Amino acid sequence: MKSSIQYLGGKANEIKYFKKYIPEYDLYVEPFFGGGSVLFDLCPEKAIINDNDKLVIKYWKSVKYDSENLINNISEYENKIDKDSYYKIRNLYNKGKVSHEDAFYFYINRIGFRGLVRRNKKGEINTPYRGDIKLNKYYNIIRQNSNCL
């Protein structure tokens, strides 16, 4: 299963090479979850995940506990995938004026450059625009991710 987000340094393309070396386990622990490619490939019965980025944690909590509401909030960005809208929304977030940070994270991850969520020294997101991408093509992947978390 694929992850609903991209993540710089993710292991989606490499897991086929090291999966056979993962020992049997009762509890899967992922201290730096990021995009979660390994977990979504394994889909363990029990797992503990963590990350040091509060937006990543907020996003995955919403995927797990409230995926339909998250999808509904993401859908509000569907007609805002052009370059001007992207920079306007990014600036609103940096001013603390975005109400659904989980949906914003998905938006910036998918519309921003290469899934990178980059911050400047002030902690503001400054990820450049990548291009317009249909966000709704990820809704079923979000649902699948929810079932695996």
Segments from the language model and where they lie:
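SAM-dependent nucleic-acid methyltransferase catalytic core
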Residues: 1-14, 21-22, 66-149
